[in-house]
Amino acid sequence: MHVTHLSLADFRSYARVEVPLDPGVTAFVGPNGQGKTNLVEAVGYLATLGSHRVSSDAPLVRMGAERAVIRAAVTQGERSQLIELELNPGRANRARINRSSQVRPRDVLGIVRTVLFAPEDLALVKGDPGERRRFLDELITARSPRMAGVRSDYERVLKQRNTLLKSAAMARRHGGRSMDLSTLDVWDQHLGRVGAELLAQRLDLIATLQPLADKAYGDVAPGGGPVALEYRSSVGGDVGPARTRDELYEQLTAALVGVRKQEIERGVTLVGPHRDDLLLGLRGMPAKGYASHGESWSYALALRLASYELLRSEGNEPVLVLDDVFAELDARRRERLAELVVPGEQVLVTAAVAEDVPGVLAGARYAVSAGEVARV
């Protein structure tokens, strides 16, 4: 799969830009702040319905504009599709496929798949659990686009349950009427159902990703492993991949009952996939706090390379996006990463200077300056 044309209107710094793209390597080169990352950010948005740089859509719309439009032509084998996303901050986004009638934005998921390497990836190893949960959930959705709906349902149910708990906490503090626990029981069941599905998908992903990540780490840093991926669940007990969804549902709902008193006191849901973490081990020790800066980079690269290999093996090779990542790496890791990604069907690279792009990544070049994109 590869993107053959990218069109942006009022996206970030671009009033309008048209960029034809080829298979193989394409590098966007220009000083920082000129708009090169905006191009690959748009491609990534098509794959995830989100940005790797900001948490909301508002910053993606050019100042003074009401909306932004991302349009891309995509080819997979003999099939070509045109995707369009309209970003409307404060209102519902819109989507179209092949100029058809409007579809839900999440209906475009799976048409474009990407694996993004960026300076922010270091947070996968050194950052908070939320960074690793996002990594897992975006990869889950790339494998199975229907999981976007499950994730959305989980967030909706969690929000409703937290609202109920906050009301109960307020009433308790002010001597009001105690809450009808049967209402909370209903929300426990809803959270347990969608939470068990999300948990099952995460566990399956980690079991599949583990050997790929270990191999990838060895490719990036020969002799530096092994690495180990372990899921730490707030539910407690055994939540291994052999557990059925029904068993996970029973564990999750039982855990909710077990902490109900504390939840009512604090007004927040204390167990569930939103409280879980992916533990990253390196040579039998936790990578967070133990791995050196270079080892942390090798680990982050290994997770992305393993993601790429997983998606590629499942039949729809993703676009590889390397956003200013080479400037963050030492010479050895830079060359190893370049050698590992160059066989990709489509590789998009951004760099401040041409010298940051390893020689093995020869291909099309675009100069990016002051919002202008010109092939060189």
Swiss-Prot record:
Pfam families: SMC_N
Gene Ontology terms: cellular component: cytoplasm
Binding-site list for ATP: 30-37
Coiled-coil stretches: none
GO molecular function, one term: ATP binding
Keyword DNA-binding: yes
Gene3D superfamilies (UniProt xref): P-loop containing nucleotide triphosphate hydrolases, RecF/RecN/SMC, N-terminal domain
Subcellular localization, as worded in the UniProt entry: Cytoplasm
Keyword set, alphabetical order: ATP-binding, Cytoplasm, DNA damage, DNA repair, DNA replication, DNA-binding, Nucleotide-binding, SOS response
UniProt record, GO biological process: DNA replication; DNA synthesis involved in DNA repair; double-strand break repair; SOS response
Main location: cytoplasm
Entry similarity comment: Belongs to the RecF family.
Function recorded in the entry: The RecF protein is involved in DNA metabolism; it is required for DNA replication and normal SOS inducibility. RecF binds preferentially to single-stranded, linear DNA. It also seems to bind ATP.
HAMAP family in the cross-refs: RecF
Protein name per Swiss-Prot or TrEMBL: DNA replication and repair protein RecF
Organism: Streptomyces griseus subsp. griseus (strain JCM 4626 / CBS 651.72 / NBRC 13350 / KCC S-0626 / ISP 5235)
Lineage: Bacteria, Bacillati, Actinomycetota, Actinomycetes, Kitasatosporales
Gene coding for it: recF
